[in-house]
Amino acid sequence: YFREQGMEAYSLQGGYTGWLLNLIQKEQPGEKENERAREIEKSIRKKFHKVLFSRFAKAINEYDMIQENDKIAVCISGGKDSMLMAKLFQELKRHNKFPFELVFLVMDPGYSEANRKIIENNAKLMDIPITIFESQIFDAVYDIEDSPCYLCARMRRGYLYSHAKELGCNKIALGHHYDDVIETILMGMLYGGQVQTMMPKLHSTNFEGMELIRPMYLIRED
């Protein structure tokens, strides 16, 4: 398959996401952007249906993540996992039996112009209509020495909840997958002496009526 696409036939670590990144980065002058997006969508429907879309749909059904008339903020960081989640949501919406709305939300915590442009270009390439808002979190945690990553993550979550609620959403979706869940458990046991994990869905205690869902909960990274 890869030789037919003009690529070298070598092992792509990371499974679908490795293939997807290679597809995005490969330059093909004159190729229409919507054709690239359709190729990605076709791969989700056929080539990677069992390992991606089936597990995505199973998690949503098994953990009762989506109800009729939900408005979901699909939170996109610009990385491979959140971009994949956005495409899976688009595919789900094509087949779902009840109505729900999607907003593809990108928070700019202080990216450089070049990094922000990469996110915008990749979203356009993959036909994901993103909404971007700014927060300047990077500036806020720049001088903090103790656990800046923890504080940054907390602030990011708060900004996402807040902006999603302003847009009329009742849920935010994050792109954590099965391997992230296992890693969180192991990190807690090894460094914190406690068992802690990521739940597939979580009601917010600070934002009334808001819920966090992780629809990639059953998807393996490899």
What name fits each language-model region?
Residues T197-E221:
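Short, flexible loop segments at boundaries between secondary-structure elements
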Residues Q5, M126-D127, E208:
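Short, structured coil segments at secondary-structure junctions
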Residues T17-W19, F138-V141, R220-E221:
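A short acidic, often aromatic-flanked loop/helix-cap motif at beta-alpha or helix-coil junctions
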Residues K32-M187, Y191-V195, M199:
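ATP-dependent adenylation/nucleotidyltransferase module used to activate substrates
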Residues W19-L23, V141-Y142, N206-E208:
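Short, charged, surface-exposed secondary-structure boundary motifs
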Residues Q13-T17, G192, P200-L202:
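Short, acidic/turn-prone active-site loops that include or flank metal/cofactor-
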Residues Y1-K42:
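Rhodanese-like catalytic fold shared by cysteine-dependent sulfurtransferases
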